[in-house]
């Protein structure tokens, strides 16, 4: 629901698809696209990134099937994995990650070396890493060694 997800929403083509988001700004951006159906999750407002999360999200998604989950993290270290600042958000991301056939992680280089309180995924839990040019080559190689596509 943060800035990385917002950049993705801006670049998403106006194509027929269903998007589930907990990001308020992401939902606003996607609402401008005629062919995109936007499902905004409710719950606790996480003020740091203007997203929402709720323990009820698991019930909401219980019968929802995801071909692809495109998620982002607030922080990453190889030791701690992908993390965020709210337990309820970590629970939501973990649940969605486990339900999806494929998981794409958006992580820009500014998040590397940072640790947030709640880990929701490890490198082996994702299929594709989407990052920026400043992402360290040595870290890219570590992902590739685990058969993770780096874009």
Task: Kindly label every feature range from the protein language model.
Residues 20, 24-151:
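Conserved phosphate- and dinucleotide-binding cores of soluble alpha/beta proteins
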Residues 1-14, 21:
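Helix-turn-helix/homeodomain-like alpha-helical modules used for DNA recognition
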């Amino acid at each position: 629901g943060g800035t990385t997800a917002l950049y993705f929403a801006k670049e998403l083509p106006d194509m027929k698809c269903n998007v589930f988001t907990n990001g308020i700004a992401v939902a606003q951006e996607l609402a401008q696209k005629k062919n995109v159906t936007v499902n905004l999750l409710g719950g606790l407002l996480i003020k740091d990134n203007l997203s929402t999360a709720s323990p009820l999200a698991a019930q909401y998604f219980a019968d929802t099937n995801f071909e692809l989950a495109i998620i982002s993290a607030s922080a990453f270290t190889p030791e701690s994995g992908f993390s965020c600042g709210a337990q309820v958000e970590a629970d939501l991301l973990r649940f969605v990650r486990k339900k999806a056939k494929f998981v794409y992680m958006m992580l820009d280089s500014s998040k590397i070396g940072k640790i947030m309180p709640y880990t929701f995924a490890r490198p082996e839990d994702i299929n594709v890493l989407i990052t920026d040019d400043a992402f360290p080559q040595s870290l890219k190689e570590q992902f590739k060694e685990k058969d993770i596509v780096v874009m």
